Amino acid sequence: MSKADIIVGIQWGDEGKGKVVDKLCENYDFVCRSAGGHNAGHTIWVNGVRYALHLMPSGVLHPRCINIIGNGVVVSPEVLIAEMAQFENLKGRLYISDRAHLNLKHHSLIDIAKEKLKGKNAIGTTGKGIGPSYADKINRTGHRVGELLEPQRLCEALMKDFEANKTFFEMLEIEIPSAEELLADLKRFNEILTPYITDTTRMLWKALDEDKRVLLEGAQGSMLDIDHGTYPYVTSSSTISAGALTGLGLNPKEAGNIIGIVKAYATRVGNGAFPTEDKGEDGEKIAQIGKEIGVSTGRKRRCGWFDAVAVRYTARLNGLDALSLMKLDVLDGFEKIKICRAYEYKGMEIDYIPSDLENVQPIYEEMDGWDKVFGIKDYDLLPENAKKYIARLEELAGVKVKYISTSPERDDTIIL
C-alpha cells in the first residue's frame, strides 16, 4: 500500500505550487485538489506557454496523470467547463467528487455585495463566492456536485432556497434567476460534467491499495488557513496538510512526504497582517521583477521580505519533510537582502505567531546579495551568497530545502 505525498503553500498563497506540482507530476499516477475553489490560481510555464489553472489539478498538463477534484473543493461548473475547454482527451483523466459542493452565480453576487457593505473593513476576498459557498456547506443548506445528475430536482431545490431567502437577496440588491434560466444552465452543466462525476474517495482508496503514486495539491497558503491563519483575513477552508487529507477522504496514516512551497521573499493579496511588507522601492522592485499580479483576481500583490517566524510556524503546522524554495531569481541584483528572524511584540522579542499578528514589528537581519541565479540548474553553480542565503533560511525554518526554482520554466529547477 502506498501513501499520498502532499504539496502545501506555507505563506499567504501564490508561492509557486503549480510549478512544483507540474515538475513532479511525471512521477505520479494521480494528482488531486483538496480544497478551495476558483479563487486559487496556479501559473505554469511549459515551453514558453503560460497556463493559468484555477480548479483543474496541475497534472492535467501530463497525459499519464489522473486528476481528481476532491470533496473539499467548491466547484463552479461554469468556470470548470471553461477551463476544461483548453484541453483535449480529458475523459478518463479527470474526475470530480460527487460530494464536492457547488459554487454558483448567486454565491459570487453575495460575496461582492457583502464586501461592498463592509466598506473599509472589507476582507479583500476574490469575489468568486467561495466564502458564501462554504457558508452554505457549514449551514447544511448547500448543494453538491452529485446533484447535477438530476438537474430538474436541483433546480426546484434552488428555487425554494431563493424564495426562502428572498428578503436577504432583496437587501443585497441581487436579482434571483428565473426557473427557466436556472434549469437551462443546470442541464448544460449536467450534459458536460456527468461523465466526470464519481466517488473519488473510493477511487483514491483503490489507488493507494494498488500502490499507485498519489500527489495531493494544496491551494492558497497556510497563513490563510481558516483556523491557523490571520483571521478574519483568511480563506474559508483548511489550507494545511491535515486539510488536504480530509478534503479527499484520506486518513492521517495515508500521508507520505509533505513538501512546503515557499517564495524566497513574501507576498500577500488582499487585506490583513503582513509583518514584512515593504512599501518602499525594494517592495516595488520585487513586485515588478516577480510579476506579482494575482492569477485569479488580477490584483497587485503586496510584497516584502522572507518571514522566517511565519515559515517556522507553518512548517510545524504542516509537519514538513522538505522545502521547495521558489523565485530565488527574483532577488537577483539586490545589494542587500533582509530576513525577518523574530518579531517585536509588546516590548518583547518573540519567535512565534501571536493571534494578533497585526501588532508585531519585524526584526531583520541583512545578508549580502548576489548577481544572478536565473536559469541555473546545478546547485554548485549558484553564487556563494545565494548558497549562504538558502542555508540561513533552512536554519531559521528548521527544514531542509529540496528544490530550488531559478526561473518560471518547468526545467529551471535544482533538485538537492
Curated annotation (Swiss-Prot):
IMP binds at D14, E15, G16, K17, N39, A40, G41, H42, T126, R140, Q220, T235, R299. The keyword Transmembrane helix does not apply. The active site is at D14, H42. Binds 1 Mg(2+) ion per subunit. One of its GO terms (cellular component) is cytoplasm. Substrate binds at V295, S296, T297, G298, R299, K300, R301. Pathway: Purine metabolism; AMP biosynthesis via de novo pathway; AMP from IMP: step 1/2. It comes from the Bacteria. GO terms for biological process: 'de novo' AMP biosynthetic process; IMP metabolic process. Its EC number is 6.3.4.4. InterPro entries: Adenylosuccin_syn_GTP-bd, Adenylosuccin_syn_Lys_AS, Adenylosuccinate_synth_dom1, Adenylosuccinate_synth_dom2, Adenylosuccinate_synth_dom3, Adenylosuccinate_synthetase, P-loop_NTPase. Mg(2+) binds at D14, G41. GTP binds at residues 13-19, 41-43, 301, 327-329, 405-407. It catalyses: IMP + L-aspartate + GTP = N(6)-(1,2-dicarboxyethyl)-AMP + GDP + phosphate + 2 H(+). It is found in: Cytoplasm. The keyword Cytoplasm applies. Gene3D superfamilies: Adenylosuccinate Synthetase, subunit A, domain 1, Adenylosuccinate Synthetase, subunit A, domain 2, Adenylosuccinate Synthetase, subunit A, domain 3. Belongs to the adenylosuccinate synthetase family. Homodimer. Plays an important role in the de novo pathway of purine nucleotide biosynthesis. Catalyzes the first committed step in the biosynthesis of AMP from IMP. This is Adenylosuccinate synthetase. The lineage of its organism: Bacteria, Pseudomonadati, Campylobacterota, Epsilonproteobacteria, Campylobacterales.
